[in-house]
Amino acid sequence: MMRITLTVILRAVFGADGKELERLRETLPPGIQLGSKLALIPVPQWDWGRWSPWGRFRQYRREYDAIVDQLIDNALADPNLDTRDDVLSLMLQSRYEDGSPMTRPEIADELITLLAAGHETTAATLAWAVERLQRHPKLLERLIADLDSGSDELLHATILEIQRTRPVIDVTFRQVKASALQIGPWTLPQGQTIVASIGLLHADETVFPNARRFDPDRFLSRAPDPAEWIPYGGGIRRCIGAAFATMEMRVILRTLLRNYVISPSSARDERWQSRGVAVAPSRGARVRIQPRQGSAAVIG
């Protein structure tokens, strides 16, 4: 799943192909994984160079910047730049209010932010989808029948329920900007950081009856309330790539289920494990699959 989602985002966001695509595939995953771990610990006062994890991360960043520079050169030399729809090309054509373009470092920073936020999280959600479906064979049968009939209504509801029960980002942060904020009996001062638990909200029985039960049918009859279902966060800070991620997951799962048979499993549910940016199945959501009769059986 990581390779599939990485390829999708590299092409859609970076406009990468050929050797640049392969170089980014090699450089970005270890760099992002290392960076997400380093973000949780203080930077040391001494610079140990390439012998330290910070030195290795800086080397990853230099390699990444060089590849993005080449992608920018390629895009600027493309006579069809104004018709391209990848995010890199759109950034190159955008202008600030004063008419100035984005600088190359700014573009590189924006691209890595979009990738770091949207690659691993989508892959982790897809892994949870496989983990859940192989443990719910009746739902799996219904899903395949629904897809074969030309509908993906149940698939959409299933993705919503997977994101409710297995949110890959468990908390979201906000900071008080007003002079004070009243929440119930508490008065929070300006500058106070608030941590909201996505997992606790999604497990609230008053919001989702039988919350511990994995039941996609709950979303067949109603759309999720954006104040209650928040795997992408909420408000003006809601994930900018939410629609893209949802579409990507629907396409990948539809392709998988139409072309492969997933073997049911009676194994215990997999535990949550941090994989850097996102929380994923502890055993990697391993599954046995075989091609469906008459399918092309190609994915990834």
Name each region found by the language model.
Residues 1-124:
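Cytochrome P450 heme-thiolate monooxygenase catalytic core
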Residues 53, 57, 66, 158-164, ...:
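C-terminal domain-closing interface element
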Residues 196-223:
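Conserved cytochrome P450 K-helix/beta-meander segment immediately N-terminal to the heme-binding cysteine loop
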Residues 5, 119-146, 242-260:
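Cytochrome P450 catalytic-core helices
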Residues 149-184, 205:
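Conserved cytochrome P450 K-helix E-x-x-R motif and the immediately C-terminal K′/meander segment
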Residues 26-30, 149-150, 238, 243-300:
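Cytochrome P450 proximal C-terminal region
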